[in-house]
């Protein structure tokens, strides 16, 4: 479907907002990571043209649309009203802000989308679209920019342009004002800058982010105290242009924890390999390689097109499309029957 990438680019708008924070006045033009506040806990960067038509991306969006028909309907209307096509977008950054409150969850999401965009046209089509459902679009000055609020029922979306070809969107007003402000950005955050440097930033999709303390503590329990603490951060890169290549890194507190988590993960992978035989996915699981590298646990997998199709078939509830191959001797913890 032509509007799938528009949906992908705008998933962040579904996340509830959080408390407003102070912001400096509007800064110069901002785009990409330069628009992401230093307070962000995680970032996902997407090179849109390079993920178009990737089978796994296509499948993931299909599943999302099936499970969220309301989302599909809303973004179909956006596609029809605003003539958004996948080729409209060139580069998208999703940034997740800090979570507040005692309940588990994530912070507000900021979407920074760059492409063939025209502010007046986007504002006009959003106004027409929300107006059809009794909603409103209001515009208010924000320094030398305009902050738009689209409201329909109990749904609110804010957006503004960081520069002529870059729109910033969020369900949280403070996320927009902070992004446009002259305050520090994600590249000024030493931890996030360090973790982002560990990801393959040349990949079509890459991400880096801090791990929630509750998740870290949970992993200690899951491993029966084999690790002293869960990972401080996760980094990932994904290339689905030909087959699928995934590289995941868990940044541990020390090499001993990385080695302990390697042992635990290999044990879990061996059990998964056995279960995967029932779905003819032993060959796929066998491509997963696990190894500790100093304080980082690395998990890598490279699948060819046939293996990707096999995985998609299994995800759809069918058996694998190809015969499972037994894992070779000496594989990195992915041995299975």
Task: Give each language-model segment a name.
Residues 32, 92-98, 155-162, 232-238:
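Short, surface-exposed beta-strand/loop micro-motifs that present aromatic residues
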Residues 1-16:
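Sec-dependent bacterial lipoprotein signal peptides
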Residues 44, 149-184, 243, 289-307:
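A short, solvent-exposed beta-edge/loop patch
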Residues 227-292:
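Intrinsically disordered, low-complexity segments enriched in Gly and acidic/Ser/Thr residues
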